[in-house]
């Protein structure tokens, strides 16, 4: 059982890193704001899928955070920083799921 959980964790981490590297590579090729927005959305959906089911909760919270930041006027202009922040946000959700919660469930 421990090997299966380790395998899932390794696959999740590898997919997360691939999503980050692919996104950073594509961001360097894109110029229009619309294309950058679509790529960041696609990256978010990918991270949400591999972090399922906590990814859905984190995605809903991200929408709320984005709405609040628009209301108060907080804006990040760098597309790279924005993509990395969103990736780290979903990575933390996946970490909680695959390394904290799964460990507690297995120990019970």
Swiss-Prot record:
GO cellular component: plasma membrane
Keyword Transmembrane: yes
Lipid bilayer topology: Multi-pass membrane protein
Domain of life according to the entry: Bacteria
Localization annotation: Cell membrane
Keyword annotations: Cell membrane, Membrane, Transmembrane, Transmembrane helix
Segments traversing the membrane: 4-24, 46-66, 81-101
Protein's recorded name: Uncharacterized protein YbfB
């Amino acid at each position: 059982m421990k090997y299966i959980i380790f395998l899932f964790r390794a696959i999740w981490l590898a997919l997360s890193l691939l999503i980050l590297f692919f996104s950073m590579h594509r961001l360097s090729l894109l110029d229009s704001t619309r294309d950058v927005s679509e790529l960041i959305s696609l990256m978010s959906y990918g991270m949400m899928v591999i972090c399922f089911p906590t990814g859905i909760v984190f995605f809903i919270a991200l929408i709320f955070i984005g709405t609040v930041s628009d209301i108060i006027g907080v804006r990040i202009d760098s597309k790279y920083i924005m993509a990395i922040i969103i990736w780290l946000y979903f990575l933390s959700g996946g970490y909680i799921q695959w390394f904290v919660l799964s460990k507690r469930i297995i120990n019970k």
